[in-house]
Amino acid sequence: MEQTYEYAWIIPFIPLPVPMLIGAGLILFPTATKRFRRMWAFQSVLLLSIVMIFSIYLSIQQINSSSVYQYVWSWIINNDFSLDFGYLIDPLTSIMSILITTVGIMVLIYSDNYMAHDQGYLRFFAYMSFFSTSMLGLVTSSNLIQIYIFWELVGLCSYLLIGFWFTRPVAANACQKAFVTNRVGDFGLLLGILGFYWITGSFEFRDLFEIFNNLIYNNELNFLFVTLCAVLLFAGAVAKSAQFPLHVWLPDAMEGPTPISALIHAATMVAAGIFLVARLLPLFRVIPYIMYLISVIGIITVLLGATLALAQKDIKRGLAYSTMSQLGYMMLALGMGSYRSALFHLITHAYSKALLFLGSGSIIHSMETIVGYSPAKSQNMGLMGGLRKHVPITKITFLLGTLSLCGIPPLACFWSKDEILNDSWLYSPIFAIIAWATAGLTAFYMFRIYLLTFEGHLNAHFQNYGGKQKIPFYSISLWGKNGVKKNSCLLTMNNNESTYFLSKTKYPIAKNGRKMTRPFMTIAHFKHKAVSSYPYESDNTMLFPIFVLGLFTLFVGAIGIPFNQEGVNLDILSKWLAPSINLLHPKSNNSLDWNEFLKDAVVSVSIAYFGIFIASFLYKPIYSSLKNLEFINSFVKKGPKRILWDKILNGIYDWSYNRAYIDAFYTRFFVGGIRGLAEFTHFVDRRVIDGMTNGVGVISFIVGEGIKYIGGGRISSYLFLYLAYVSVFLLVYYLLF
């Protein structure tokens, strides 16, 4: 076993040859490299599979022996300063390694078909392999310096992939937004690392924890400074994991290819922040108020992400806000000290969210056969509907991921989310109420996405729904709008422009809607030889990863079922995390009262089903029959209550669709303020500083011309004037000084 750990340092470097060879091939043999470009997908999958097998083997050994291995070698030694590098293999490392490799392999297989016709195919796989290397290096790091180096590399790969289609201004802007937002957190992380080095004199995790605990025990620290350093460290995790208030980059990151959205949201960039807090939890838990701050940020993000997902029309943005909310649950669990629950939810959410994103990619891929290549149209749920008939396999797997995220047993996320919800009651009743209410919102917005996408009829085939004015099909839904105002930062709804859900207006459906052969939309800038009337199921190379992730979603929750009775122990996760849990909670007891568990499970599942029921009631395919509208309208009549209800709905819509006005606030005050300062600085530089410099030159020129005119071109006159000026200056100096 010791020999196996000795070779674990190679884990981050196994996928590295792919980007290096692709780069060398494009420089030395560009034609051959591009011609045989599909072989790089096989090599990427092969190398990452080797890492996966190695990680699984290490994990099995850790489960059986509860061991932790660390190897360190000194790189720089100078008097009292030494910089060490090494690797740490513990349960957290092995869990993250398996997550990165399993999800990464599925995404790579999926991407081979998804990106097959993209000119940046080679560039994409080079970035992806380097992304895997960076993330594996991050999770195996044994000190804060290595963490920071690989932290920045993970960010670099994320920016490259978010802005992969950099010729599109929207993608370029999203890349810049992610970069600038994460700069704030990364700067805080760097300051926090330097602060704790100044306090303890070490970057190594083991030494750092031990020295810091001794200083705390002996009361030799300035707690205000220590708390500030801890907050700065936490700021890095806030930005990376899209926690409030540095969450604004996450929905815009959907401008990248869909496979990278799956990887970022499941096992890499956003998981890095959760990993950092989990790694530093022995440090945070002994600092006053920092754990409470982590839980507060987590619960705010839980609720904010759920409310912002309610009105999204873009399927990927809806899933992005869902990720934000679920990451908030993990951060809340870490803030409460529920280490096991947080990592359990990290595992289950990773597979469920990867399944949902790859499923959305399959949906987008199929919609492009109708609307052409246009992300604004192919990702718009208002143009979808009825896809269950055309993409049945994608529909089944997407439903599995949706039910899992809703917390429906026995799917994966039910077990992990239920633990967090139960622990929240012991920590704070207020936090518990918010967390449980958000569980219902999660079920609502996830089933909203599912119903708008798969149920009803294909909305892209309908052009008019009553009246002379053409309105989008999705405007009939609860969160609909008549259209998008261009060049407007904020969008609002009022009684004149909104189309209410509970109205007596009938919306006739085109009789020939399902027999149309002409596409609903065409793109002038994109050439396509033929466009299909209906979407079709994706190829097997895209369906295979979705199917495998569906199996993970079904069964991965079993590793954390807290069943330990009569000598039968099914709780693999607790055995796996035993060294870390014993470090944090030496006298912890993982036994569970099953009566209490079943009681809480019934409540949480009931809340989830209530959210599903509301979503089904509001978003079921009512357009196939007007009887549903008549049934609803029989309960609601026009009047003051109806007007008030509509205003409330419109207010909720405006809040959600405009991202809680946080982006607008940042744009107006931060971006506008910085631009105003830049313009003022430019004015001072050009008008004042340059004016002074140019003014001296102009005055010198005028004086010179004057002397030239008075002197008449004679050298004797110039000498006389020069001596006169010198005499005047000497006289003034003598009189004054």
Curated annotation (Swiss-Prot):
Top-level lineage group: Eukaryota
GO MF annotations in UniProt: NADH dehydrogenase (ubiquinone) activity; quinone binding
Transmembrane segments: 9-29, 40-60, 89-109, 125-145, 147-167, 185-205, 219-239, 258-278, 286-306, 327-347, 354-374, 396-416, 425-445, 543-563, 602-622, 717-737
Enzyme class: translocase
EC number: 7.1.1.-
Locations listed in the record: Plastid, Chloroplast thylakoid membrane
Membrane topology: Multi-pass membrane protein
Keywords on record: Chloroplast, Membrane, NAD, NADP, Plastid, Plastoquinone, Quinone, Thylakoid, Translocase, Transmembrane, Transmembrane helix, Transport
Any single GO CC term annotated in Swiss-Prot or TrEMBL for this entry: chloroplast thylakoid membrane
UniProt key word Flavoprotein: no
The reaction(s) this protein catalyses: a plastoquinone + NADH + (n+1) H(+)(in) = a plastoquinol + NAD(+) + n H(+)(out); a plastoquinone + NADPH + (n+1) H(+)(in) = a plastoquinol + NADP(+) + n H(+)(out)
GO BP annotation list: ATP synthesis coupled electron transport; electron transport coupled proton transport
NCBIfam families the record matches: NDH_I_L (TIGR01974), PRK06590.1 (NF005141)
Record family assignment: Belongs to the complex I subunit 5 family.
Function: NDH shuttles electrons from NAD(P)H:plastoquinone, via FMN and iron-sulfur (Fe-S) centers, to quinones in the photosynthetic chain and possibly in a chloroplast respiratory chain. The immediate electron acceptor for the enzyme in this species is believed to be plastoquinone. Couples the redox reaction to proton translocation, and thus conserves the redox energy in a proton gradient.
Subunit structure: NDH is composed of at least 16 different subunits, 5 of which are encoded in the nucleus.
Name of the molecule in the record: NAD(P)H-quinone oxidoreductase subunit 5, chloroplastic
Native species: Solanum lycopersicum
